[in-house]
Swiss-Prot record:
This is Double C2-like domain-containing protein alpha. Its main location: other. Ca(2+) 1 binds at D120, D126, D181, D183. C2 domain 1 is involved in binding calcium and phospholipids. Residues 89-211, 251-384 form the C2 domain. Residues 1-89 are annotated as: Interaction with UNC13D and DYNLT1. It comes from Homo sapiens.
Length: 400
């Protein structure tokens, strides 16, 4: 800044900040709380009740629910404890969960959603709900509702059921519930999801949820990826220690078996009832499963039994029964091998999974076998996990 020609003038920072300031009354500085609507405060409470003036709530900072006109929970509805808000930009989902320990089933009642995010050009969506048990990646592990057309407040009232659910699943698994928008011309779009640890459920007690949908949260950085990998590594080590040095086996589905030793017929009755969540072995995303059983040691190689083939399914029902003539004292030294196969025409059949029951088995498989020996003439049904471990003698018989 210059005064007379050739003279240079200097100004301090206070004078610089005062230049070009419009005259007028001094306005109060806005507080952060002024940008959010406030309900009436408690009677006699300080801080001032009522809502902030409308001109102090910029549209960009308004709560997303205010833009979508989301509603509040219905009076008397039982809301889960970690439901903090009933209105988000993604919407809310209402559902019930019930774990039936007696039948080893998890019942999922998908009720309704409210205030979903618009996904189509008409400002609406074609929503459906997809369920997935984690960890687990097979197609049979996924269940879905029907699609509701052109709505942001869909009502489903559908019951989806997982079979073969054990107490171990309830302890370790998580139910992922995703709401998606169906698009016939392109890929379906993800709207939001909810993840419920099954350990929050109590047997035979229905639990009601009304929860805000959340976005998928990716790992933010390589450092978080490293932390996640370290956590997975520790988890796997704990599992390995729990298995007392045994290798970790891939889960390939579940099978429901019935065992009964008949005192009258002097033999073992093996019931192959059904399978659930089998691994898909064919390119169409399904399998053509059948079940084989062996009672080993099998010196005469006459103990093989085989069910019929069920086409294009990951949840087959067999309801077939096989009989092994054997004394109870001899049965105590035997091992029952049960394997599930995918039938292929003109080539070797694919091994899906298997389980062994006998004195050398572990966990539920051993308990089922010992209960059968200790309770003659009682039909005992149990679910068993199929693993990727192929019995040594079964590999040579895969085409049988």
């Amino acid at each position: 800044m210059r005064g007379r020609r050739g003279d240079r003038m200097t100004i301090n920072i206070q004078e610089h900040m005062a230049i070009n300031v419009c005259p007028g009354p001094i306005r109060p500085i806005r507080q952060i709380s002024d940008y959010f609507p406030r309900g009436p405060g408690p009677e006699g409470g300080g801080g001032g009740g009522g809502e902030a003036p409308a001109h102090l709530v910029p549209l960009a900072l308004a709560p997303p629910a205010a833009l979508l006109g989301a509603t509040t929970p219905e009076d008397g509805a039982e809301v889960d404890s970690y439901d903090s808000d009933d209105a988000t930009a993604l919407g809310t989902l209402e559902f019930d969960l019930l774990y039936d320990r007696a039948s080893c089933t998890l019942h999922c009642s998908i009720l309704r959603a409210k205030g979903l995010k618009p996904m189509d050009f008409n400002g609406l969506a074609d929503p459906y709900v997809k369920l997935h048990l984690l960890p687990g990646a097979c197609k049979a592990n996924k269940l879905k509702t029907k699609t509701q057309r052109n709505t942001l407040n869909p009502v489903w009232n559908e019951d989806l059921t997982y079979s073969g659910i054990t107490d171990d699943d309830i302890t370790h698994k998580v139910l992922r519930i995703a709401v998606c928008d169906e698009d016939k011309l392109s890929h379906n779009e993800f709207i939001g999801e909810i993840r419920v640890p099954l350990r929050r459920l109590k047997p035979s007690q229905k639990k009601h949820f009304n929860i805000c949908l959340e976005r998928q949260v990716p790992l933010a950085s390589p450092s978080s990826m490293s932390a996640a990998l370290r956590g997975i590594s520790c988890y796997l080590k704990e599992l390995e220690q729990a298995e007392q040095g045994q290798g970790l086996l891939e889960e390939r589905g579940r099978i429901l078996l019935s065992l009964s030793y008949s005192s009258r017929r002097r033999g073992l009755l093996v019931g192959i009832l059904r399978c659930a969540h089998l691994a898909a072995m064919d390119v169409n995303g399904y399998s053509d499963p059948y079940v084989k059983t062996y009672l080993r040691p099998d010196v005469d190689k006459k103990s093989k039994h085989k069910t019929c083939v069920k086409k294009k399914t990951l949840n087959p029902e067999f309801n077939e029964e096989f009989f092994y003539e054997i004394e109870l004292s001899t049965l105590a030294t035997k091992t029952l091998e049960v394997t599930v196969w995918d039938y292929d025409i003109g080539k070797s059949n694919d091994f899906i999974g298997g389980v062994s029951l006998g004195p050398g088995a572990r966990g539920e498989a051993r308990k089922h076998w010992s209960d059968c020996l200790q309770q003659p003439d009682a039909a005992l049904e149990r679910w068993h996990t199929l693993t990727s471990e192929l019995p040594p003698a079964a590999g040579a018989l895969s085409s049988a």
